[in-house]
Curated annotation (Swiss-Prot):
Functional summary from the UniProt entry: Catalyzes the NAD(+)-dependent oxidation of L-threonine to 2-amino-3-ketobutyrate.
Name assigned to this protein: L-threonine 3-dehydrogenase
Organism: Burkholderia vietnamiensis (strain G4 / LMG 22486) (Burkholderia cepacia (strain R1808))
Residues at the site labelled Important for catalytic activity for the proton relay mechanism but does not participate directly in the coordination of zinc atom: D148
Textual note on the cofactor: Binds 2 Zn(2+) ions per subunit.
Keyword Translocase applies: no
Length: 342
């Protein structure tokens, strides 16, 4: 089958032919329709330090997808041939303390699709049926293919009650931008997002941001004054992994505020703990999606009017994958979709 793989320990990916995956007793085989390019895939493309330490070579990658079930293992229940599905990209052990307590997103033995094992940038993907998630007919293939990052945004944004709250989001990547739409959808008052990328800040405005602030040119404090915010933000969502952004977020938080961290900062990043301790801040680390509460919330929000369509900005046939990666690398894109049926 056709697949997009890392064949050499060097930058780039190669469109190649690989063996179609075998289907275990508890697996489903998915014929891929659409995939989306993730920031993780950009790390793999660049072959940075993280990728060199993490990614087996050779291996086809990718973990954001939608497709239909074409084969099932003999022990699979609850699915049928032809079901349209996406899937949870974190495959968990089922036996550790957290898995057995129903907290699978905290499994200490997590294996990542397209990171630690063969991925979705291929014509077919085999995954445990437990990880497959049926997509309702009213949700498009494009949106279904980005449920993985949409889930990151949902898990982060809904970590705390947002109704009537003032929310600061640092980092206007696709996940941060989707968090804007989620926060407004569930009833936040002011939703302010910061970055230095004008293209993505404009996308955030389209998705409902109260203010999208280029911090290279505009003061966050001035924006807070403009919005008549006298005490700081109630909820902070750190999506960038940039130390200076995290610092500014902590400084802008109100006393008793709550902070969720999805962005991954460099090791040994300095924190002004006075901001945390004397403000009584609550800080929560976010990894992946809650299984499968996050997934049900994503569907419910889309069915109740959440519009994420502006976040998909580029679409390419898989044979033009290099154009798709170029769009992502340019910084002037939202989500980039690769069509495996074209």
């Amino acid at each position: 089958m056709k697949a997009l793989a890392k064949l050499e320990r060097a930058p780039g990916l190669t469109l190649t032919r690989v063996k179609r995956p075998e289907v275990g007793h508890n697996d489903v085989l998915i014929k891929i329709r659409r995939t989306a390019i993730c920031g993780t895939d950009i790390h793999i493309w660049k072959w940075d330090d993280w990728a060199q330490k993490t990614i087996p070579v050779p291996m086809h990658v990718g973990h954001e997808y939608v497709g239909e079930i074409v084969e099932m293992g003999q022990e699979v229940r609850g699915f049928a041939i032809g079901d349209r599905v996406s899937g949870e990209g974190h495959i968990t052990c089922g036996f550790c303390r957290n898995c057995r307590a129903g907290r699978r997103h905290l499994c200490r033995n997590t294996v990542g699709v397209g990171v630690n094992r063969e991925g979705a940038f291929a014509e077919y993907l085999a995954i445990p049926a437990f990880n497959a998630f049926k997509i309702p007919p009213e949700i498009s293939d494009d949106l279904a293919s980005i449920f993985d990052p949409f889930g990151n945004a949902t898990h982060t944004a809904l970590s705390f009650n947002l109704v009537g709250e003032d929310v600061l989001i640092t980092g206007a990547g696709p996940i941060g931008i989707m968090a804007v739409a989620i926060a407004k959808h569930v009833g936040a008052r002011n939703v302010v997002i910061t970055d230095i990328n004008d293209y993505r800040l404009e996308l955030a405005r389209k998705m409902g941001a109260t203010r999208a602030v280029n911090v290279a040119r505009e003061s966050l404090r001035d924006v807070m004054a403009e919005l008549r915010m006298t005490e700081g933000f109630d909820v902070g969502l750190e999506m960038s992994g940039v130390p200076s952004a995290f610092t500014s977020l902590l400084e802008a938080m109100n006393h008793g505020g709550k902070v969720a961290l999805l962005g991954i900062p460099p090791a040994q990043t300095a924190i002004d703990w006075n901001q945390v301790i004397f403000k009584g801040l609550e800080i929560k680390g976010i990894y992946g999606r809650e299984m499968f509460e996050t997934w049900y919330k994503m569907v419910a929000m889309l069915q109740s009017g959440l519009d994420l369509s502006p976040i998909v900005t580029h679409r390419f046939a898989v044979d033009d994958y290099e154009k798709g990666f170029a769009a992502m690398l340019s910084g002037e894109s939202g989500k980039v979709i690769l069509d495996w049926t074209a």
